[in-house]
């Protein structure tokens, strides 16, 4: 997403990862900044995308939740996990949680961004600022759909099955 955002003139603050080499690699690839610690990237960003494996989203959230998050948008890209499940207690922090899932198979972190302009993005989360999150992708020319938290697992299952059938047909 970072490369896609940068190529479309959206500001990307930078990258943080517990593995500094991965964050430096992402920052170099996107021509942004390597951020040395989680607290700094949270402080200087208004919207944060936690692009970590699904089973680590809540772990990262738990490291962030006691920081100053008032008014910030916290997003993850899981197809199955709802924003509420990923970010328990986010409303108490004054922040807003979103699941922003591209209906798109990311097979190569260095090249998949080239096709993201054709992806649908499915958004679930706090209704208060949902239109602002959707606007990011609408302004890039992407189609956006909203989904209820209760439908996330069914949606993810359908997406995975369809994707696997297409791959099987191609092979």
PLM regions: where:
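Internal alpha-helical scaffold of NAD(P)-dependent oxidoreductase catalytic cores
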Residues: 22-26, 112-155, 162-171
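Class I S-adenosyl-L-methionine
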Residues: 6, 24-28, 65, 91, ...
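Short, structured coil segments at secondary-structure junctions
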Residues: 8-9, 29-31, 70, 92-93, ...
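Rossmann-like NAD(P)(H) cofactor-binding subdomain of soluble oxidoreductases
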Residues: 34, 38-112
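Alpha-helical elements of the RecA-like P-loop NTPase motor core of helicases
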Residues: 3, 24, 58-59, 84, ...
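Short, hinge-like loop/turn segments at secondary-structure boundaries
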Residues: 30-33, 91-94, 115-117, 163-164
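Short, hydrophobic beta-strand segments that form beta-sheet elements in well-ordered domains
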Residues: 13-17, 74-77, 121-124
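NAD(P)+-binding Rossmann beta1-loop-alpha1 motif at the extreme N-terminus of oxidoreductases
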Residues: 1-36
